[in-house]
């Protein structure tokens, strides 16, 4: 059910975002405790502000009321993805080159399944990350199809 809902919401929100020069980052439809939440994460090259989130929320809410794909009460939340934005699509990896990332893989690569470091390259099939290995830095090449999840990482000094 949640996959079906997110697909419908994606179809509804995409034209709204295109009209506002915004992009869809992610959609979550989850139950937390007794409540259901429909979360839509949006962004643009210049970031998003609360007014844009509010406008998208209003327009999407109208569309959801028309189509009514969710049979029970839920909370609609529209927001930016935040500082640790998920990297979901190939273009997200390309835009993140030069930034710090955190990547989990489906299976170990060089004995590890988690990597944190600077994303230095992405060619569509391989994600290259420079990570610290004890006292030195080394580059790890991760096949894109082995990436289970990835996000920007905030590094505190």
From Swiss-Prot:
List where this protein forms a coiled coil. none
Q: What does this protein do?
A: Required for maturation of 30S ribosomal subunits.
- Keyword set, alphabetical order: Cytoplasm, Ribosome biogenesis
Q: Which GO terms describe its cellular component?
A: cytosol
Per the record, the similarity remark reads: Belongs to the RimP family.
Subcellular location as annotated? Cytoplasm
> Which superkingdom, per the lineage?
Bacteria
The UniProt entry, under Gene3D superfamilies, shows: Ribosome maturation factor RimP, C-terminal domain, RimP-like superfamily, N-terminal
Protein's recorded name: Ribosome maturation factor RimP
Q: Which PANTHER family match?
A: RIBOSOME MATURATION FACTOR RIMP
BP terms from Gene Ontology = ribosomal small subunit assembly; translation
Highest classification ranks of the organism? Bacteria, Bacillati, Bacillota, Bacilli, Bacillales
What would be one Pfam family of this protein? RimP_N
């Amino acid at each position: 059910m949640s996959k079906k809902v997110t697909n419908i919401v994606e179809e509804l929100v995409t034209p709204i975002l295109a009209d506002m020069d915004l992009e869809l980052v992610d959609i979550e439809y989850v139950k937390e405790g007794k409540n259901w939440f429909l979360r839509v994460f949006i962004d643009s090259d210049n970031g998003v502000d609360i007014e844009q989130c509010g406008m998208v929320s209003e327009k999407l809410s109208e569309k959801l009321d028309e189509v009514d794909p969710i049979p029970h009460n839920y909370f609609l939340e529209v927001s930016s993805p935040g500082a640790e934005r998920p990297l979901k699509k190939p273009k997200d990896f390309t835009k993140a080159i030069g930034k710090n990332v955190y990547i989990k893989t489906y299976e170990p690569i060089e004995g590890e399944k988690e990597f944190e470091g600077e994303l230095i390259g992405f060619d569509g099939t391989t994600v290259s990350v420079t990570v610290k290995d004890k006292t030195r830095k080394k580059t790890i090449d991760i096949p894109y199809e082995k990436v289970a999840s990835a996000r920007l990482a905030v590094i505190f000094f």
